[in-house]
């Protein structure tokens, strides 16, 4: 028994010195890195205020787009808040199709969910009021808490600068 173990260890040492082991690599083969910012162009691309500032300027020049207490110490539910935010953003983007002028700001104050948006006035005011009530009522039913939407209407998309 001991002789067979010695033979196996000698065999393994021969293979390990020859470099015959295979390993699994979990990194991407192309190794491309992309910065989280808008690329510089010819100066003909309009940018909003949120797009013009880089991500490291959050809390200095621009604010967070989602305000909640899920990331505080000993507070749970941060992952659930992110999923809720993604659902709310997609739902409102689909409901008010081609009317959003800028990103949504989602605030949670106690049990109330407040959604702030800047929209382009492409629809009649009566249709905006209907979609506003529809969105508030449906999201209140989904999340079992009061939902309030604060809208600001503009004539056209507000351009901060061109890049």
UniProtKB/Swiss-Prot annotation:
InterPro entries: Ribosomal_uS3m. One of its GO terms (molecular function) is structural constituent of ribosome. Disulfide bonds: none annotated. The keyword Ion transport does not apply. Transmembrane segments: none annotated. It is found in: Mitochondrion. Keywords: Mitochondrion, Ribonucleoprotein, Ribosomal protein, Transit peptide. Its main location: mitochondrion. Residues 1-31 form a transit peptide. GO terms for cellular component: mitochondrial small ribosomal subunit. One of its GO terms (biological process) is mitochondrial translation. It comes from the Eukaryota. Belongs to the universal ribosomal protein uS3 family. Component of the mitochondrial ribosome small subunit (28S) which comprises a 12S rRNA and about 30 distinct proteins. This is Small ribosomal subunit protein uS3m. It comes from Danio rerio. The gene is mrps24.
